[in-house]
Amino acid sequence: IKNFKNYFKTSEAKWITYLSATSVYGDHNGQWVDENSETKPTSLNGVERLKIEKDWMTLSNKFNLPFQIFRLSGIYSNQYNILTRLKSGKAQIINKKNHFFSRIHVEDIANILSNSCNHFKKNEVYNISDDKPASSEEVALYGVKLLGINKPKTVEVNKIESEMLKNFYKDSKRVDNKKMKKFFNYNLKYPTYVEGLDYIFNNII
């Protein structure tokens, strides 16, 4: 952000959009969160994201630029998704009861960003997420069904070795996206992981 302090003195920028993450909400025990929910990040990534949101807000106010925050849920794409991980043999199922996680396909992110170029309000926050929060196990099992393969091994959450995965499974929440859909008048191309994985399976894999 320091690199932009001088840039905005002479630039013709009309607004600032920061792509943040729903990790800023932290753990809400599987409950729904919206843009007014408490931010209480548990991971280093979430803490840093929240700080950067505030830094960008300060900078945008200094130059009187409209500012919007897009809090992205877990991103997947036609190239990076549970189907490719299952096919590679690298996927595993983590056993943790009542762990909910929201997702968003990268195409929907791009479409919403494009819409926002001509349709934005000053100092707003939007959750960018699909309609169906689900456990990682639920999504993986749907992928197994599509591919017609055996279920990968199950690992208990307290046996996870990866620090990144440990941080991921600290948080459980369902991300509400009604504000995003209403303001941008946007119908998701992939409203749930089902449509997203079906498309990838039928057209990419």
Regions picked out by a protein language model, each given a short descriptive name:
Residues 57-101:
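NAD(P)-dependent short-chain dehydrogenase/reductase
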Residues 116-165:
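Mid/C-terminal beta-alpha module of Rossmann-like enzyme folds, strongest
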Residues 141, 160-187:
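Conserved C-terminal active-site "lid" loop/helix of NAD(P)H-dependent oxidoreductases
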Residues 29-69:
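Catalytic helix-loop patch of NAD(P)-dependent Rossmann-fold dehydrogenases
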